[in-house]
Amino acid sequence: MGPSAPLLLLFFLSWTGPLQGQQHHLVEYMERRLAALEERLAQCQDQSSRLAAELRDFKNKMLPLLEVAEKERETLRTEADSISGRVDRLEREVDYLETQNPALPCVELDEKVTGGPGAKGKGRRNEKYDMVTDCSYTVAQVRSMKILKRFGGSAGLWTKDPLGPAEKIYVLDGTQNDTAFVFPRLRDFTLAMAARKASRIRVPFPWVGTGQLVYGGFLYYARRPPGGPGGGGELENTLQLIKFHLANRTVVDSSVFPAESLIPPYGLTADTYIDLAADEEGLWAVYATRDDDRHLCLAKLDPQTLDTEQQWDTPCPRENAEAAFVICGTLYVVYNTRPASRARIQCSFDASGTLAPERAALSYFPRRYGAHASLRYNPRERQLYAWDDGYQIVYKLEMKKKEEEV
């Protein structure tokens, strides 16, 4: 061993001494941490056991209550089924009584008409209408309905253009508004956030009531000019028809409707003064005047010029009427009660005189108790588009052939 060996030994001993002290402190620290973790674990186990015991007690208390609730639910379900069966039975009995004792339909064939040409712009009055198509159908019954959704307020109009794209939907909410919603297809209209999918078209003058019509790419509607019905002034008794081009968004024509002292044609729909309709024959208008405040009037319009071609005084009463539509030149008036009950077609008027009285049967709408703010017939689909207290409904119609009058 050389002279440097003792020095190396002393250096090694001096270096390992502090290392052993650090290891000792580290072991003590780990032991303290493990003891703390064991204590916290024991506390968690005690708390878990206590919560499990409380949960068992709560479950034992709830089980009898759940059994009682289940028994009550079954009892309520049984009572509901019983009430539903009784309601169905009552409706069948009412339907039977309605078929056994139907209200007499109001039908007029207009045989005694001798009226000549009317004043300029008013058209011929009470002359039989000459059909321009071979349409010869009448309503047999309102077969079924489908509730699409609820959109807008209690009164409004939704429809399709019978001469336009088959999928496009037009929605006009309210009785005094100037903005129409246009949906590219029915599926977009049924979405929860439907308004985001719609384009908006604003007309220059607000419409009146729910008598608007989309036909051949145009929006036809009645406008109240300053001083129109309800507004006072010189034009107190007049309304102006507007023809609005939906694509160009411009007014292409307008005309003062040639009837004085206008009043709402439907006793249950006070905001509508002129109800426009379209069928296989073209454009029609339903209205009423103070000259005969008990019955409806019908007019055939020229969709190009808005001229009135013919007018008729119908036997259909205004009282309890809520809406109407035209099919193959025949006016069908829908009646209801207040408060609302089951709507029914109780009066029809064939302008051409080909509908035999016995063929104009009373027809009830499917089982829904509501009030129709508007009805629009689509001749391409043979369906009615209805607005019922904010609900948009489609009615399918069953047709039958008209019988020629002998």
Swiss-Prot record:
Carbohydrate attachment residues: 177, 248
Disulfide-linked positions: 135-328
Domain named Olfactomedin-like: residues: 134-401
Localization annotation: Secreted
Source species, domain of life: Eukaryota
Segment forming the signal sequence: 1-21
InterPro entries membership: Olfac-like_dom (IPR003112), Olfactomedin-like_domain (IPR050605)
One GO term describing the cellular component: extracellular region
Keyword flag Ligase: no
UniProt cross-references to PROSITE patterns, sorted A to Z: OLF
Coiled coil ranges: 25-101
Keywords for this protein: Coiled coil, Developmental protein, Disulfide bond, Glycoprotein, Secreted, Signal
Positions of transmembrane segments: none
Principal subcellular localization: secreted
Function noted in UniProt: Secreted scaffold protein that plays an essential role in dorsoventral patterning during early development. Stabilizes axial formation by restricting chordin (CHRD) activity on the dorsal side. Acts by facilitating the association between the tolloid proteases and their substrate chordin (CHRD), leading to enhance chordin (CHRD) degradation. May have matrix-related function involved in placental and embryonic development, or play a similar role in other physiological processes.
UniProt similarity note: Belongs to the OLFML3 family.
Protein name: Olfactomedin-like protein 3
Organism, as annotated: Mus musculus
Gene name of this polypeptide: Olfml3
